[in-house]
Amino acid sequence: MSHKSCYTNPGTGGKRPRNDKGNKVTVVLGAQWGDEGKGKVVDLLATESDIICRCQGGNNAGHTVVVDGMEYDFHLLPSGIINSKAVSVIGNGVVIHLPGLLEEAEKNEKKGLKDWEKRLIISDRAHIVFDFHQAVDGLQEVQRQAQDGKNIGTTKKGIGPTYSSKASRTGLRICDLLDDFKEFSTRFKNLAQQYQAMFPTLVVDVEGQLKKLKEYAERIRPMVRDGVYFMYDAINGPPKKILVEGANAALLDIDFGTYPFVTSSNCTVGGVCTGLGIPPLNIGDVYGVVKAYTTRVGIGAFPTEQLNEVGELLQTRGHEVGVTTGRKRRCGWLDLVILRYANMINGFTAFALTKLDILDVMDEIKVGVSYKLKGKKIPYFPANMDVLQKVEVEYEKLPGWKSDTSACRKWEDLPVKAQNYVRFVENHVGVPIKWVGVGKARESMIQMF
């Protein structure tokens, strides 16, 4: 490989050319509070992808994919693992609970998922979620409830405590587990002791845990790679279709979400670069997944929430129950302020609008188009939760189509009023809608362009 300079001498006023080489990465992100149906969009794109990656979060995410009538549930594994021709990557930004990962793989194996371990690559820089992180997650929730009378509503999967360990530089990574086990054991014991000092009721079976971790190390060793080099090679090698599957969603982002009722990672587009070690230059299409109405799990402000028959109807018709927690989701009308905000941050190429069929029975459908604060319209999405609680939503009313859309497979098949609803969203947010979902199966995603 020659290392000749590829740009002219700066002294002569020459400019370095923009390096536009390499494969582009397609990204799928949630544009609301999660549960938008990202798994289905990923599944659609994964059939043609060579590499499918997760870049952040852990097994707090829940994606359901239906293939040939069989439902697969994914939490840590990229849902593209179903594609037997593709490689799945768990990036450095993901936090990994090893027993959770193996249990999930085995459960899906029983449903027919074959040879997953030959298709999975785990970044050696990913941090490990230990059982005590999960225990601490539960203890912190109890503490919050006692102090403030409210909790964050975490999934108790140890995600927050693991990212805390990572930020305070006491965390342990996959590369540590696979290296000198004696050194790993010492650091593991120190970390456990730190948590026990903070939470005196915390019980940690150190020796039992280490014994299991040693076994996990051997199970995963063949799957572990240097993630940065792997992605660099994939991007700069022969043409490949690379897909990144975001977990959680814009309003759960640690920086841009409805803080503190958020997750502990960046679930917006920036998390793709930091969670896989890829340059922004190689980000291609960014698809936002939007449900045709809004849902939220746990507490926190929710301007368009409907605590009435509408909310109940959306909840029952949409089967709005969390994949990871089994909790009922709160439901409300579609909120375009949220979508515009998510688009400001992510710069979506297009939207996938899912679960349109849930609105089939409505006489009238409302869409939140703007917020007012003290009688004045505000052009932004408030950062402060107390302020967000106080906003007044301005709605536009659209007539319902009152007919079953679940059998529609082409845009022309949709009732005109349903088409109007889709166009209304596009025009108000300024992002084209590429897919419209009218059911659970792969076939029920109508592609528009």
From Swiss-Prot:
Binding site for Mg(2+): D35, G62
Source species, domain of life: Eukaryota
Gene Ontology CC entries for this record: cytoplasm
Keywords of the record: Cytoplasm, GTP-binding, Ligase, Magnesium, Metal-binding, Nucleotide-binding, Purine biosynthesis
Residue segments, region Disordered: 1-22
Cofactor note: Binds 1 Mg(2+) ion per subunit.
Residues annotated to bind GTP: 34-40, 62-64, 329, 355-357, 437-440
Names of the cofactor(s): Mg(2+)
A Pfam family hit: Adenylsucc_synt
Catalytic activity: IMP + L-aspartate + GTP = N(6)-(1,2-dicarboxyethyl)-AMP + GDP + phosphate + 2 H(+)
SUPFAM superfamilies from the UniProt entry: P-loop containing nucleoside triphosphate hydrolases
Pathway: Purine metabolism; AMP biosynthesis via de novo pathway; AMP from IMP: step 1/2
Binding site for IMP: D35, E36, G37, K38, N60, A61, G62, H63, T155, R169, N248, T263, R327
PANTHER family per record: ADENYLOSUCCINATE SYNTHETASE, ADENYLOSUCCINATE SYNTHETASE ISOZYME 1
UniProt similarity note: Belongs to the adenylosuccinate synthetase family.
Summary of the function given for this chain in its UniProt record: Component of the purine nucleotide cycle (PNC), which interconverts IMP and AMP to regulate the nucleotide levels in various tissues, and which contributes to glycolysis and ammoniagenesis. Catalyzes the first committed step in the biosynthesis of AMP from IMP.
Protein name as catalogued: Adenylosuccinate synthetase isozyme 1 A
Source organism per UniProt: Salmo salar (Atlantic salmon)
Source organism phylogeny: Eukaryota, Metazoa, Chordata, Craniata, Vertebrata
UniProt gene name: adss1a
